[in-house]
C-alpha cells in the first residue's frame, strides 16, 4: 500500500479563533458550520490550543446542574464573558503536513485527542480527525 500523507486527507485551512475571543463566538461557529474542533491561534498565528464543542458543552452543563430559574440568562452571560483561553485544551500535539496517516493513527491511539492541528513550516495548514484517516479506504 502506498504511503498516504496528511496533506491528502486533512481538512485544509480550518476555521480558527484566538485565545482572547469570547466563548460565544466559538459556539456560533460550531452551530453555523457543524464542526466540532477549532484550532486556537496566538496573535502571531501560532497554534496555542484547540477548543471543542465538548469544552463549551461542559461549561454550560455545569451550570445546568443547579435548579436556578435564571440559568439560561446566566449561561448566556457566561458565554459572553468567558474567553477561549479559559476552556481550550493547551499544549496541543501537532503533526506535520508530510506525516503519514499511520503517524496520525499512532497519536490518536496513544493520546486522548479527537482532532490534531497540522502544520507546515510551523504554520497551521489543516486539521485531521480519526474519520479523515479512513477516507482513503472507503470506496463508493
Spans of features found by a protein language model:
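Tandem CBS (Bateman) regulatory domains
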Residues: 1-13, 52-93, 105-109, 129-140
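Short, flexible active-site loop motifs that bind/organize anionic cofactors or intermediates
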Residues: 13-16, 46, 94, 123-124
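A generic helix-loop boundary/linker signal
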Residues: 16, 20, 46, 74-78
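The conserved cystathionine-beta-synthase
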Residues: 17-35, 40-42, 88, 94-112, ...
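A glycine-centered beta-loop-beta connector
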Residues: 30, 38-55, 108, 116-132
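Short, charged/polar low-complexity linear motifs in solvent-exposed/disordered segments
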Residues: 34-36, 44, 65-68, 76-77, ...
Amino acid at each position: 500500500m502506498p504511503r498516504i500523507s496528511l496533506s491528502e486527507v486533512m481538512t485544509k485551512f480550518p476555521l480558527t479563533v484566538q485565545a482572547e475571543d469570547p466563548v460565544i463566538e466559538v459556539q456560533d461557529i460550531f452551530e453555523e458550520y457543524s464542526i466540532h474542533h477549532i484550532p486556537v491561534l496566538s496573535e502571531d498565528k501560532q497554534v496555542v490550543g484547540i477548543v471543542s464543542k465538548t469544552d463549551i458543552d461542559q461549561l454550560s452543563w455545569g451550570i445546568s446542574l443547579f435548579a436556578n430559574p435564571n440559568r439560561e440568562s446566566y449561561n448566556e452571560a457566561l458565554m459572553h464573558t468567558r474567553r477561549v483561553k479559559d476552556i481550550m485544551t493547551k499544549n496541543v500535539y501537532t503533526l506535520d503536513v508530510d506525516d503519514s496517516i499511520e503517524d496520525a493513527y499512532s497519536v490518536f491511539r496513544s493520546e486522548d485527542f479527537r482532532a490534531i492541528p497540522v502544520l507546515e513550516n510551523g504554520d497551521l495548514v489543516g486539521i485531521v480527525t480519526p474519520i479523515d484517516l479512513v477516507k482513503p479506504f472507503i470506496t463508493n
